[in-house]
């Protein structure tokens, strides 16, 4: 009996002990590792993972490896090495590792965000980027769409004049409508129950993707019941059912001679492929309804929660730093005034606001650790070998909080992005990648930057944004999920007297 147990343990140890493919190669320094559990017993048990990995750099250097369950993962925490992974060797490291939770969220590795590199990922990324090009000019200009939704947002907030409210849902509605217009040319009215459905499944997917699921680290655990996976499947099904309903309804009104949104772009690509009018890289099988709705789901998931979260982080930092907020009001008043609403061209004038947004993205990046990459081939990072199939994580938190790159990195200092005179935006460090880089960079970066600037400019022009009467400031600790969330908080909304007077003058 004991001989069999010993044999089983030795077999498991052999199967799950990390192996080197190139005996003479130099690999990154590694944390201690045990069979089956890997380095898990030796990782810090408290605190945010991105910060714990950052602290481990002091002992192991800017690149090191950990054995996460049965997988070897390389952690990269320096901008030069990160750019090598993302840009210089972007093709080598453009893969996505297979993980149980990501497979569920991506309908078995479809879409863009969690799909492995290959023909389907390249095709859908290219089509998504082509869609954003539709919104450069004319009636569909991105700025026009964003501003019409912000106008509705501001009108709604004005009805809460003098009240302390959580602005999460109002901002969520505005950002959701922008994405919906880009994807379907439709938007939701306030009170539409579908908005709550979208918010609930978004939150459910983000929450369950981010839980410390052993099944992602030890894949064979999938054979056992798993509450996290079941909850994730439930939320993904709700998302898929909703998007499938939208897709089926849209098919009836699709016109191939009028391509105006993302769904049009994807459906036209499928039609061309079915008719033999597409290139060899545009296989019809890669444009099934399931592929299409997963890509739309990715755009919704990435575009809504990220922007909403950054707006809330920005407001939170301004409530904590009233002196910066005061300067922003002065900048708005002097450069925009109250006779017109802010436009994207005001980015050249509202430099402190732009610097503030950049500083928020540095201090609280949307994703403190980028979605894991995977080595598609045997490659290297710096002087170290990286075997094919190895998972690579870019610790963006480490890049953005490196004391050698940033003066007082934990302090909120928007002025670091301005020259001493405050008349020009600057790049104080190359260790700054808020939207990633290379083949896997965020395709919605332009949209996100426009939304963040315009939302904040409009809010600051119209409202005094104050700490509630109870004096409760937002927590800046954060909740690290797939997106770095902030705890719910309230802000006191007061319509600015100068704005009110300007509107009264304009109506006479």
From Swiss-Prot:
It comes from the Eukaryota. It is an enzyme of class 1 (oxidoreductase). GO terms for biological process: androgen biosynthetic process; glucocorticoid biosynthetic process; hormone biosynthetic process; progesterone metabolic process; sex differentiation; steroid biosynthetic process; steroid metabolic process. Its EC number is 1.14.14.19, 1.14.14.32. PROSITE patterns: CYTOCHROME_P450. Substrate binds at residue 202. Belongs to the cytochrome P450 family. It is linked to Adrenal hyperplasia 5: A form of congenital adrenal hyperplasia, a common recessive disease due to defective synthesis of cortisol. Congenital adrenal hyperplasia is characterized by androgen excess leading to ambiguous genitalia in affected females, rapid somatic growth during childhood in both sexes with premature closure of the epiphyses and short adult stature. This is Steroid 17-alpha-hydroxylase/17,20 lyase. The lineage of its organism: Eukaryota, Metazoa, Chordata, Craniata, Vertebrata.
């Amino acid at each position: 009996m004991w001989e069999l147990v010993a044999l089983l343990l030795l077999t498991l140890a052999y199967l799950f002990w990390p192996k080197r493919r190139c005996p003479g190669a130099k690999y990154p320094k590694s944390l201690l590792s045990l069979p089956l559990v890997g380095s898990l017993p030796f990782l810090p048990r408290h605190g945010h993972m991105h910060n714990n990995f950052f602290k481990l750099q002091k002992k192991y250097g800017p690149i090191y490896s950990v054995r996460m369950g049965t997988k070897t993962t390389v952690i990269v925490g320096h901008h030069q090495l990160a750019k090598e992974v993302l840009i210089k060797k972007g093709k080598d490291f453009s893969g996505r590792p297979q993980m149980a939770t990501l497979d569920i969220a991506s309908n078995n590795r479809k879409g863009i965000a969690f799909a492995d590199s290959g023909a389907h990922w390249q095709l859908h990324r290219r089509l998504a980027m082509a869609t954003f090009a539709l919104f450069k000019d004319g009636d569909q200009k991105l700025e026009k769409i964003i501003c019409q939704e912000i106008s509705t947002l501001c009108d709604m907030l004005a009805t809460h004049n003098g009240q302390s409210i959580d602005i999460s849902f109002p901002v969520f509605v505005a950002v959701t409508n922008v994405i919906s217009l880009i994807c379907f040319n439709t938007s939701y009215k306030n009170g539409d129950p579908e908005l709550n459905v979208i918010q609930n499944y978004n939150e459910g997917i983000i929450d369950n993707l981010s839980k410390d699921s052993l099944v992602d680290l030890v894949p064979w655990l999938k054979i056992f019941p798993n509450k996290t996976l079941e909850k994730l499947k439930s939320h993904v099904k709700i998302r898929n059912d909703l998007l499938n309903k939208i897709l089926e309804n849209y098919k009836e009104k699709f016109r191939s001679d009028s391509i105006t949104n993302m769904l049009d772009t994807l459906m036209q690509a499928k039609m061309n492929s079915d008719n033999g009018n597409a290139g060899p890289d545009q296989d019809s099988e890669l444009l099934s309804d399931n592929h299409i709705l997963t890509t739309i789901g990715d755009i919704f998931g990435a575009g809504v929660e990220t922007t909403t979260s950054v707006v809330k982080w920005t407001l939170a930092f301004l409530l904590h730093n009233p002196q910066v907020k005061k300067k922003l009001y002065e900048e708005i008043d002097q450069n925009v005034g109250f006779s017109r609403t802010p436009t994207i061209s005001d980015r050249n004038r509202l430099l402190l606001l732009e610097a503030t947004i950049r500083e928020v993205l540095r201090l609280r990046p949307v994703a403190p650790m980028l979605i894991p990459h995977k080595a598609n081939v045997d490659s290297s990072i710096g002087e170290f070998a990286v075997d094919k199939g190895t998972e690579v994580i870019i610790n963006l938190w480490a890049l953005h909080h490196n004391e050698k790159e940033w003066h007082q990195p934990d302090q909120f200092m928007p002025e670091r992005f301005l020259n001493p005179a405050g008349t020009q935006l600057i790049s104080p460090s190359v260790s700054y990648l808020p939207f990633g880089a290379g083949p896997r960079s965020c395709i919605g970066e332009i949209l996100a930057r426009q939304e963040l600037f315009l939302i904040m400019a409009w809010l600051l022009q119209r409202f005094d944004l104050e700490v509630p009467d109870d004096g409760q400031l937002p927590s800046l600790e954060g909740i690290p999920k797939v997106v770095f969330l902030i705890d719910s908080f309230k802000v006191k909304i007061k319509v600015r007297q100068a704005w009110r007077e300007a509107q009264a003058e304009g109506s006479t």
